[in-house]
């Protein structure tokens, strides 16, 4: 009988978050008593099905050593050096797992600045994709009216929101498939902005799995306030 697949996670954390307008990378900002990345890693490491979490760090990251000694779940954490773009960091994270992961194992790639991920959403993603040959991602249906503009900022079209989703993370795919898809994209100098795009480019069809709307990514200063509220509310559930 074939062994069941293992689950691994990769967290690209080499970015600097320019839109936040702060002096330090956004993953090291304080949120609900800990740094953003500590909150994020805590969500992943606490899940019993995730074997280990690889954190892809910037080559000149001087802040990680200041929080690393006090991180929970030390036995689950691995680190590697990230790259110039998210796709480079994720690929390096996958390489770190080469001696651990089997081809059919699952890898969950999750944003370092998405600290409100709920345990139930990880459960839902794993359960929904358990028998899927490719994998998929968490997302939320678009609720707002969508507009397309020209380069001058003038509205040129209203885009139908039917079957339109906001892609979120984790994005979960088979280890070998994702590694090859990212390698092919990088070799073609295509800088995909998420893992699903690499899988789509390889000719596969990821599955969308609906998640909670509070699984936000911290991108702008006001997002910190919102994330603080969400984390406090989750503690009360």
List where the protein language model places each region.
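Hydrophobic helical membrane-anchoring modules
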Residues: 215-237
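Short phosphate-binding loop-to-helix
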Residues: 70-105
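Generic C-terminal helix-cap and adjacent flexible tail
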Residues: 2-5, 99-103, 230-237
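Short aromatic-hydrophobic micro-motifs that form the base-stacking/packing surface
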Residues: 106-110
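N-terminal glycine-rich phosphate-binding loop and ensuing alpha1 helix
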Residues: 2-62, 75
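Conserved core of the sugar-phosphate nucleotidyltransferase
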Residues: 116-209, 237
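Residue-level signal for inorganic ion chemistry
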Residues: 11, 37, 93, 111, ...
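Acidic helix N-cap motif at the loop->helix transition within catalytic regions
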Residues: 62-68
